[in-house]
Amino acid sequence: MKVAIIGAGIVGSTAAYYLSKEAQIDVTVYDHGVGQATKAAAGIISPWFSKRRNKAWYRLARLGADFYQELVEDLAKDGIKTDFYQQTGVYLLKKKEEKLDELYQLALSRREESPLIGDLAILTKE
């Protein structure tokens, strides 16, 4: 079977990687650029603070972010360099403290289903 994948961003590259593991599948990736960042998110994977009301979008974004760890582990097992990935923290800045509190509570509730969020804290000037 031949499969054509349009775009070598995170979704296209991941699909190509897993499909290419199947001997009966011949994968070709088409992309107009080489060595550039994704146009979707500039490499930032952090859907947990999104206030979008579309639950299907959030679920897809959350599961994708959670899956990233598995992808990196699979790549490493196959001897593929994974130095492109580094899990770091996120700083959110808000002019109004109540907005920051809202996001903090949102992240706390979402951390139950997605522990990858990690530690949460509100930093003050002190």
Question: What are these model-predicted stretches?
Answer:
Residues M1-V11:
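Beta1/beta-strand and adjacent pyrophosphate-binding region of the FAD-binding site
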Residues I5, A40, L63:
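Conserved active-site and cofactor/substrate-binding residues in soluble primary-metabolism enzymes
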Residues G7, D31, K94:
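Short beta-strand/turn micro-motifs composed of small residues
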Residues S20-A41:
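Glycine-rich FAD pyrophosphate-binding loop
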Residues I44-E126:
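Dinucleotide-binding Rossmann-like beta1-alpha1 core, especially the glycine-rich loop
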